[in-house]
Amino acid sequence: MTPEEQAAHQELIEQARLLFAGRVEFLKSAPALKFLPDPDVPEIAFAGRSNVGKSSLLNALTGRKSLARTSVTPGRTQELNYFEVGEPTRLRLVDMPGYGFAKAPPKVVETWRRLVRDFLRGRVVLKRTLLLIDSRHGVKPVDDDMMQMLDEAGVGYRIVLTKADKIKASELEKVTAETIAAARKRTAAYPEIIVTSSEKKMGIEELRAAVLQDAMG
């Protein structure tokens, strides 16, 4: 980065910090597209396997302890959960239903696929999807399926590694390289990934800045 680019990046990080330090509120849960809020502000969606740490990351991102409920039952969230950021509202975060739940009946899985596919293809204010991948496991076949769905919908997405504090540095380096390689094979994936730990607050500043940049871009 040039000194000018570095200064601009630091300014973006500070703007994002101030934004998320302000108003962040749960708006609604939408079990079907007809319940979505009016498409009047930019939206950033969060996707990931069940138990990937999505709720914990949303809580860390917003600086709240229990904004997004952490469920002990994987695959429990089968709705699009909306959170508003800013006063007045500058953007909305969309917590998408988790995928890859082994015990879900086929009907539930099909309902999930239809809801997510139709949301991705038809939501004009959706600026970016953040695809969360567990650092301990790397990209799984179900993650590949989600990437394919995003590619087909033409929705740009960033890959975010979660729980980076749970593995050794050498293992993290390996899974990061493998994830970058997987992203570069995809048409709609952002080529750089963000490595995070909700528990250690690692990468949270960068993630906030990315969310703000994507929403306003």
Curated annotation (Swiss-Prot):
Which superkingdom is the protein from?
A: Bacteria
Keyword Metal-binding applies? yes
Pfam families, per database record: MMR_HSR1
Q: Which family does it belong to?
A: Belongs to the TRAFAC class TrmE-Era-EngA-EngB-Septin-like GTPase superfamily. EngB GTPase family.
- UniProt keywords, alphabetically: Cell cycle, Cell division, GTP-binding, Magnesium, Metal-binding, Nucleotide-binding, Septation
User: Which residue numbers delimit the EngB-type G domain?
Assistant: 40-217
Write out the residues that bind Mg(2+): 55, 77
Q: Which organism is it from?
A: Novosphingobium aromaticivorans (strain ATCC 700278 / DSM 12444 / CCUG 56034 / CIP 105152 / NBRC 16084 / F199)
What does the record give under GO molecular function? GTP binding; metal ion binding
Q: Where does GTP bind?
A: 48-55, 75-79, 95-98, 162-165, 196-198
Which InterPro entries does the protein's record reference? G_ENGB_dom, GTP-bd, GTP-bd_ribosome_bio_YsxC, P-loop_NTPase, Small_GTP-bd
What GO terms in the biological process aspect are recorded for it? division septum assembly
Cofactor(s) this protein cannot do without? Mg(2+)
Q: What does this protein do?
A: Necessary for normal cell division and for the maintenance of normal septation.
Protein name as annotated: Probable GTP-binding protein EngB
A single GO CC term, please? cytosol
PROSITE patterns of this UniProt entry?
A: G_ENGB
> Does Magnesium appear among the keywords?
yes
